[in-house]
Amino acid sequence: MEDFVRQCFNPMIVELAEKAMKEYGEDPKIETNKLAAICTHLEVCFMYSDFHFINEQGESIIVELGDPNALLKHRFEIIEGRDRTMAWTVVNSICNTTGAEKPKFLPDLYDYKENRFIEIGVTRREVHIYYLEKANKIKSEKTHIHIFSFTGEEMATKADYTLDEESRARIKTRLFTIRQEMASRGLWDSFRQSERGEETIEEKFEITGTMRKLADQSLPPNFSCLENFRAYVDGFEPNGYIEGKLSQMSKEVNARIEPFFKTTPRPIRLPDGPPCSQRSKFLLMDALKLSIEDPSHEGEGIPLYDAIKCMRTFFGWKEPYVVKPHEKGINPNYLLSWKQVLAELQDIENEEKIPKTKNMKKTSQLKWALGENMAPEKVDFDDCKDVSDLKQYYSDEPELRSLSSWIQNEFNKACELTDSVWIELDEIGEDVAPIEHIASMRRNYFTAEVSHCRATEYIMKGVYINTALLNASCAAMDDFQLIPMISKCRTKEGRRKTNLYGFIIKGRSHLRNDTDVVNFVSMEFSLTDPRLEPHKWEKYCVLEIGDMLLRSAIGQVSRPMFLYVRTNGTSKIKMKWGMEMRRCLLQSLQQIESMIEAESSVKEKDMTKEFFENKSETWPIGESPKGVEEGSIGKVCRTLLAKSVFNSLYASPQLEGFSAESRKLLLIVQALRDNLEPGTFDLGGLYEAVEECLINDPWVLLNASWFNSFLTHALR
């Protein structure tokens, strides 16, 4: 390697390199790779400066050798290559004459045109890793960093490369030549592997032993050791990094980073079309319960027994008829299905002993409603691959739907309080540590705020229905089992209550894969007249089945009772998540907890008690066309819970896509509000990605509308 250095580099450069090594107590004859690295670095610094001058007008010009204008001022002052004392003298002189901030470490050059010190780096590793090591060492925004690699890559602070392209190309070509020459002599591998990271003069917390091994094993794939990753993270400067990467891409990539101002974003475009319709697996605000208080009947707790007992509390049954037909369905079949349920329940009551489960007779109306024998026959691919016109099953694009007011009403209703308690506080033992005491206190306060909430009723209803349906799907695969839709709660006085919302009839359920579908028919009681918002009930056939006497301010009034019937379907994986809807409580509690933590860190003490008991304070709940809505801490708890519950009830690919893409836009707007001067490229593409998720889902359309309200008020 020593011979190579003496042949390859100018003798003056070699002499300077040897002198520098001796100054640091290193032997150039032993540490030959270090000698080669210093020579390379010196040569790059000299090439960086060569031919660059400043004319009398203060403009930067390039002057080739032999030009008569030798009296021009050099653009760059070379600091690298001088002995330390002299180098610091030059730096101090520059700082005194230009007013530049004195750097902590000796830089390599000073640029009189841009008035900044420059640190030049030449690396055998990845440019961005070396760049970040340099940035982490220097810790100064005033010193400009410019890194070159032997592979032709480069990286500079804020992607400002200082020199013209031709000058940089000269440097890159020289580095590539050095690499080729080393490789031809078998010296490159040793030279490449000998590079160490930048050493900073600061104490480091050393991780050793097992923890060190685990740390090294846990790194992202591009990093060989913890130090590289630490340097990368500490010095990461996203804007400059992105611009640097863009500049290295093919010329076909023309992504320009545009500044993002208050006037930049436009509202998200919501689709036009007929109003969206209800698509939840069970009725929400429109559900009606037949209830029994303090149940103590024989077989109490067995769903079928409970259902029959609830049905007996109602005396206003009448001959059912269709009041709102399903546009595409055979409505008489829905009517016959309900009549069959009533008849078979009557048969059970006539028996001496009521069975624990009820399998419905496989009548023509139920076979139709449950899609029996409707699935296309599956054929082995080998038996049909010779069919000439074999093609994928054709399906229409989904029809675009517009936002309808009913979904906002549903959400508002979910945030309201009911007159029942839907969750009990579990006994989980005494608190031991102080943190457990704080956790219990928060949980108790939160539970008190949400236990009466309608969203909590939806959770318990969803858990019950999905559990019962999954059990029946596994236990009675071939049967059309009748499954009562039940929930349990306590009254304000603490009395137990069992509620019946209606029935489900399950179809054949040979569910092998998580996504295999089981069909079911749902029949749910309601007092809502479907003719008021027919678009909401597009997927339903609605029957009038009785008259209910209700107490009102003017005495008893009779109201028609309806039955909402529809064919629906679900899968094992959807039922599994439905059974775990209680997680919504945890998610919203965690969101409230982060608000308490923020408050506590400001006040430097736990603020849980004050947070929940200061009834006069209001908190932001969300955006509406009127502005930022505010409410009590209880209202915040219930709103966050309702959002989480609706995310579960209306889960869909459209929601996944909208949440992921709109979050990017939200972060950009948030950065603007925090005065971080965000930049974007292809903002149109981001809007496209957001808007392609707005098709027909009511919950997604409502979220998009809320997002537009947020944009309006956030950017005022």
UniProtKB/Swiss-Prot annotation:
GO terms for biological process: cap snatching; DNA-templated transcription; symbiont-mediated suppression of host gene expression; symbiont-mediated suppression of host mRNA transcription via inhibition of RNA polymerase II activity; viral RNA genome replication; viral translational frameshifting. Plays an essential role in viral RNA transcription and replication by forming the heterotrimeric polymerase complex together with PB1 and PB2 subunits. The complex transcribes viral mRNAs by using a unique mechanism called cap-snatching. It consists in the hijacking and cleavage of host capped pre-mRNAs. These short capped RNAs are then used as primers for viral mRNAs. The PB2 subunit is responsible for the binding of the 5' cap of cellular pre-mRNAs which are subsequently cleaved after 10-13 nucleotides by the PA subunit that carries the endonuclease activity. Phosphorylated on serines and threonines by host kinases, including human casein kinase II. It comes from the Viruses. This is Polymerase acidic protein. Belongs to the influenza viruses PA family. Mn(2+) 1 binds at H41, D108, E119, I120. Mn(2+) 2 binds at E80, D108. Its EC number is 3.1.-.-. It comes from Influenza A virus (strain A/Hickox/1940 H1N1). A motif (Nuclear localization signal 2 (NLS2)) lies at residues 184-247. Its cofactor is Mn(2+). Influenza RNA polymerase is composed of three subunits: PB1, PB2 and PA. Interacts (via C-terminus) with PB1 (via N-terminus). It is found in: Host cytoplasm; Host nucleus. HAMAP family: INFV_PA. Keywords: Cap snatching, Endonuclease, Eukaryotic host gene expression shutoff by virus, Eukaryotic host transcription shutoff by virus, Host cytoplasm, Host gene expression shutoff by virus, Host nucleus, Host-virus interaction, Hydrolase, Inhibition of host RNA polymerase II by virus, Manganese, Metal-binding, Nuclease, Phosphoprotein. GO terms for molecular function: endonuclease activity; metal ion binding; RNA binding. A motif (Nuclear localization signal 1 (NLS1)) lies at residues 124-139. It is an enzyme of class 3 (hydrolase). The gene is PA. Binds 2 manganese ions per subunit. GO terms for cellular component: host cell cytoplasm; host cell nucleus.
